[in-house]
Design a protein with these regions (language model features):
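Flexible, low-complexity junctional segments that flank or bridge functional domains
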Residues: 1-280, 286-288, 297, 395-398, ...
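Loop/turn elements at helix/coil->beta-strand transitions in domains of secreted/extracellular proteins
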Residues: 245-247, 275-280, 351-355, 377-381
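Active-site-proximal beta-strand/loop segments in catalytic clefts of secreted hydrolases
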Residues: 251-255, 283-287, 312-319, 358-362, ...
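Extracytoplasmic/secreted cell-surface and envelope-processing proteins
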Residues: 259-260, 289-298, 364-370, 391-394, ...
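Glycine- and acidic-residue-enriched helix-capping/beta->alpha junction motif
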Residues: 267-268, 272-340, 375
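Extended C-terminal subregions enriched in glycine
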Residues: 354-376, 381-389
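BRCT (BRCA1 C-terminal) domain core and associated BRCT-interaction motifs
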Residues: 377, 382-432, 439-440
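Low-complexity, Gly/Ser/Thr/Pro-rich intrinsically disordered linker/tail segments
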Residues: 421-467
Length: 467
């Protein structure tokens, strides 16, 4: 894990600069008075979804929506006011061409179309829920692998395979979306496998060209297998702590505070029980998020420290009347204006216990935030697929527009990590790729084959998990 830890530590040293993103975190005094007190109350009240409304009512809701976004949306300046102004103009022009009675479904779809720049790059954001899944399916990246097609890697970094005693070296792929990635198999071997990580529409048939020492070429077709997330009811807690002969298994599928607070507090405390383990399997597959305070507390308990556990980032909280009303009072000092921005420099922690974190593309929001927090520890390996990619804008709220009942969801806090690249709908790549549905069995086989823990411990833990 030495090379992986070096990579994680290097990532921690990158903090997006407030100067580089000055436009995205700028103060906007004009936005402070965009919503009246009655409009704020109306947004927070909740309204029934309508089938049709008058043109005047539709226009009123459109105006309210765009003023609400400017006032309270954490990524408003990140995308830029000119894009939102153009979107509002497009919807307004469309309304002017319609009959006096407006179908709410048609309006919702038009809003989605005009705000595609936002919805395609902010996974938490939602405008008009009935068609939200269709939008996500178009912009979501998927992980495919060429099952049964494996390479080895030599000391020079070349990928090759041996057929009938002859070495064939990777020359090229037919598709720019294809790459070679370290991949964990069910028998515990780590190989190098052709991997396609792309939008579903780009998952086309591909080929690979190999060459021997004399330059002779062979072309093979690559048949893609789509990876599968863990089959689990999303949003359930499913907290488990299983320990056997030095092997610790921890699973948690949600960090949502409220209903499960007592169990989450227990989970956080029991991080201490993993101390002294020979290895820890930390299963975050299917963890849809909630509050990242819980994984922070687990890590503190595991390390035996009260020091802050932070990933390096730049964050900017939008201070608005809507935010203040929803939270009873503003959480920000008045002298910060409409935007409170800070650079956070993460801290690296030494740790000699191997921690293998299992992820899939349902691991999102503070679920994948937990993955990033765990990467501030030495000896951590992330195994599975890409995470979900719900990172750009957090502290999520849902509102309904008063006349149409159209649902609106967005966050008030902008988060930028590493080099500032937006990972929404793409997620974070694992250190070692593995079909998530097989990740647990594959990791148990790896630990057994490497002699980290006993075969009996692996089998006992597996049996207890499937019970």
């Amino acid at each position: 894990m030495v090379e992986t830890s070096q990579t994680h530590r290097a990532e921690l040293e990158h903090v997006p600069s407030a100067a580089d993103f000055a436009d995205a975190i700028s103060d906007d005094p004009a936005s402070a008075g965009l919503l009246s007190e009655s409009e704020v109350e109306s947004l927070l009240r909740g309204h029934a979804a309508m089938e049709t409304v008058s043109k005047e009512q539709a226009q009123s809701d459109v105006s309210l929506l765009f003023r609400t976004l400017q006032s309270a949306y954490g990524a408003y300046e990140y995308f830029g006011q000119e894009k939102f102004d153009a979107a509002e103009d497009a919807v307004t022009q469309w309304l002017s061409s319609q009959d006096d009675e407006i179908k709410v479904s048609a309006l919702g779809e038009k809003l989605q179309e005009s705000l595609a720049f936002m919805l395609a790059h902010d996974a938490h954001a939602m405008i008009y829920e009935p068609a939200a899944e269709e939008i996500e399916a178009q912009v979501r990246y998927e992980y495919f692998f060429a099952d049964g097609f494996y390479f080895s890697k030599d000391v020079n970094g070349s990928y090759y395979m041996v057929n009938d005693g002859e070495r064939w070296t990777l020359s090229s792929f037919s598709d720019e979306h294809v790459s070679v990635q370290p991949t964990l198999l069910q028998d515990g071997r780590i190989v190098y496998q052709p991997t396609l990580f792309a939008l579903r529409k780009d998952a086309v048939q591909s080929s690979v060209t190999l060459k021997n020492s004399s330059g002779k070429a062979k072309i093979y077709r690559l048949d893609w297998t789509e990876s599968q997330p863990l089959d689990v009811d999303l949003g359930t807690l499913d907290y488990r702590l299983i320990q056997e002969d030095g092997l610790t298994y921890v699973s948690l599928r949600s960090f949502v505070s409220g209903t499960y607070d007592n169990m989450l507090a227990r989970y956080a405390r029991e991080g201490a029980k993993a101390r002294g383990s020979k290895a820890v399997i930390y299963d975050l597959r299917g963890n849809v998020g909630g509050s990242d305070s819980w994984p922070r507390k687990w890590i503190q308990s595991f390390l035996g420290t009260q020091n802050s556990i932070e990933n390096s980032m730049l964050y900017a909280q939008k201070n608005s009347a809507l935010f203040a009303a929803e939270n009873s009072e503003s959480l920000l000092p008045e002298d910060e204006g409409t935007c409170f921005a800070r650079e956070v420099h993460g801290t690296w922690y030494e740790n000699d216990i191997p921690i293998i974190v299992l992820v899939d593309d349902h691991c999102g929001s503070s679920g994948e935030g937990a993955v990033q927090l765990l990467k501030t520890l030495d000896n951590v390996l992330i195994v599975g697929s890409n995470t979900a990619g719900y990172q750009l804008c957090g502290n999520i709220s849902t509102f309904t527009l008063p006349y149409t009942g159209i649902g609106v969801r967005f966050g008030s806090t902008l988060f930028l990590y590493g080099d500032g690249e937006n990972v929404d709908h793409r997620g974070y790549a694992p250190d070692v790729w593995c079909d998530p549905q097989d990740a647990l069995a594959s990791v148990l086989a790896l630990l057994k084959e490497q002699g980290v823990v006993s075969a009996d411990a692996c089998e006992t833990v597996r049996e207890k998990i499937v019970q």
